[in-house]
């Protein structure tokens, strides 16, 4: 039975395609594990929904992954982590559930001066979880919350470097370009897919970071702690599902997994 558990897949879910940026890090750090990814593109973006709606959709996603045999679950969505992680852990006490949050602490530690911009959904920036992060680390540096409604939709449509998304990001970031910006935190798992565009706009001196590595390190730690890590020496399997059940969205998912 323990061997079955070790070989069981790790479930990832997100409001759409963004969580693939976190899954990509897992494939890099733990290639021998099996994975299931569930993207809820039918209901994307979560960032414009109420906390109650986000919780309901998150419970549906976890039920899907558990029925597929997931041994652990990664909430690869900042918005869902903020709104639902506590309730999910309370309900599913027997399964490790790992969330993701804006990487504000490492962003502040990187530099002794300069402001930090946190790009995220409105829902993430207004939740208690982010307010707690601000209380903990915001006093050490100017932290600029920057809601980006509309950016998720570009990525869901596969527009990662077109003129429209470049203009959108330029309009968002231009008001801050006369300040000393030390780093930008990508507080939505969709946003790493447009990291190169952001870097071009702000310049190479600005560090751009996200929470993927920290989340996967925590996943690894929890699996080891519970003696659940795979002992296979072979590359694991990956199954991708999406609530849209659209062939194009699955093709785009596979393409995004391969982008470095």
From Swiss-Prot:
Q: Name one GO biological process term.
A: regulation of cell shape
Print the keywords alphabetically.
Cell shape, Cell wall biogenesis/degradation, Isomerase, Peptidoglycan synthesis
Q: Check the record and name the Pfam families matching this protein.
A: Asp_Glu_race
Q: What class of enzyme is it?
A: isomerase
The EC designation for this entry is 5.1.1.3
Q: Mind telling me which InterPro entries this protein's record contains?
A: Asp/Glu/hydantoin_racemase, Asp/Glu_race, Asp/Glu_racemase_AS_1, Asp/Glu_racemase_AS_2, Glu_race
Pathway(s) annotated for this protein in UniProt: Cell wall biogenesis; peptidoglycan biosynthesis
The active site consists of 77, 188
Whether Isomerase counts among this entry's keywords is: yes
Q: Identify the residues that bind substrate.
A: 14-15, 46-47, 78-79, 189-190
The UniProt GO MF terms for this protein read: glutamate racemase activity
The UniProt catalytic activity note for this protein reads: L-glutamate = D-glutamate
- Read off the NCBIfam families from this record: glut_race
The family note in this entry says: Belongs to the aspartate/glutamate racemases family.
Q: What does this protein do?
A: Provides the (R)-glutamate required for cell wall biosynthesis.
Q: Know the name of this protein?
A: Glutamate racemase
Which gene is the coding source of this polypeptide chain?
A: murI
